[in-house]
């Protein structure tokens, strides 16, 4: 792999810098369902190591692992209780070191998931924070004192009641959680929090990893005053949840203190980042991130629900082409990420092709060809290369995903038809793509 920077010119774009992560193919692995090495039914690090020759044979340059850190697994490992320990069912630090060594031996690279919008409520920081308002870790998180009354409305992705505030008796205050109740949001306003995160990143870079995929990174900056939201005056209410102006200051600080010190790759998950904003994240002159991936592709669906705009945009080739063209242009001097599916999305064959037996293989080849021939760095999800399709569940009891389960509970609590949730989740649920390979 050549990490030299060479200037090249492309149509309409000058001074694009060549580097290894622009010329790479990224293969995403959800460890739990990839390869089990010890017969306990759970994929693990040694299982991944045993499959490296296969992965290399695909032409893969970079492996991205979903979270492998210690976690109670309320949200598939995205609730981290220790950033410097390996999830026990995945193996040990020695297993990780062996995996990393074997990846590099094959001239591939390794990218880890960085989850720093929130921690687990079982992380030592939060266990201390929730004891007392006077605890030094209290300000590691966002709180609303009960004496100020009910907190201003903020919605949660995974809370069964939809409320992003949860009362904590010992501090007589509410903590913020944009995701589940067991995922309290970190307070990036606190410089001590930022330094803890930067130190943790250095720990993994010093071990030899090659980059981070940054989960929900657009959500880390909040206005700590939590103003009331007037949806009539401010139709883009998500600006109150994310993209707060300090976000770019934090990312630049991260780049200056950590990323710029290593030959590494950084890609951010751009929840609610609009096409007009993407250049702010990836313009090399701004020194923030290398790449950012967006969610507009996820809104184009083969199946949409009537009278439900959240269910997406009806699929058409024109809609898909228009969306990718807009994002490619908006990236400008930055570099695009190209993907059609991941751990949060249904299988690309089921969404953008046909998963019927007679068309499944053809669809998979067509979509992989698209990924590999677009300008940008392609990401594919393990199993796409064999045309894996969605599994479809008929009962809520079949689901493990907290998002699906809480959507179902919320619908029942509000007197809505829970079957409508099941019908939607058969097409869009996160569990659909996470079955064992």
Task: Write out the residue ranges for each language-model feature.
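Active-site and adjacent substrate-binding regions of carbohydrate-active enzymes
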Residues: 1-435
